[in-house]
């Protein structure tokens, strides 16, 4: 998401500390472990999800579906890119403590994908 310049240059007391970020990551990892505990396969994180798991755990609302579809068409993304975007969006939602993958998570994941293709391809 876009960063407000004044917030960036202003008082940094609002910024998360490394310890807070660490706790958020630990909570997200616990959510993922619990999510996949009943899976037949040994899956420990969103990155390991296959297509079936993605369909189960990355349900999208109509706005999110449209956003992802538009990105796929405009950027000429593959099925593999589609799945990667959904895995990243699911992880972003987990880090936020949100059980639903929302449009903002899809948008952020698409931005990461675009950066990856632009600067590290």
Where do the language-model regions lie?
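Basic, amphipathic alpha-helical bundle interface domains used for macromolecular binding and assembly
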Residues: 1-120
């Amino acid at each position: 998401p876009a960063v407000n310049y004044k917030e960036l240059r202003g008082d940094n007391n609002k910024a998360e500390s490394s310890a807070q970020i660490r706790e958020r990551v630990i909570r997200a990892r616990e959510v993922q472990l619990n999510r996949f505990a009943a899976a037949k396969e040994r899956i420990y994180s969103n990155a390991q999800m296959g297509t079936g798991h993605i369909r189960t755990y990355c349900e999208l609302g109509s706005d999110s579906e449209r956003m992802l579809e538009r990105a796929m068409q405009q950027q000429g993304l593959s099925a593999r890119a589609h799945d990667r975007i959904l895995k990243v969006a699911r992880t972003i939602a987990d880090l936020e403590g949100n059980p639903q993958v929302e449009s903002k998570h899809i948008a952020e994941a698409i931005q990461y994908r675009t950066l990856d293709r632009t600067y590290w391809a």
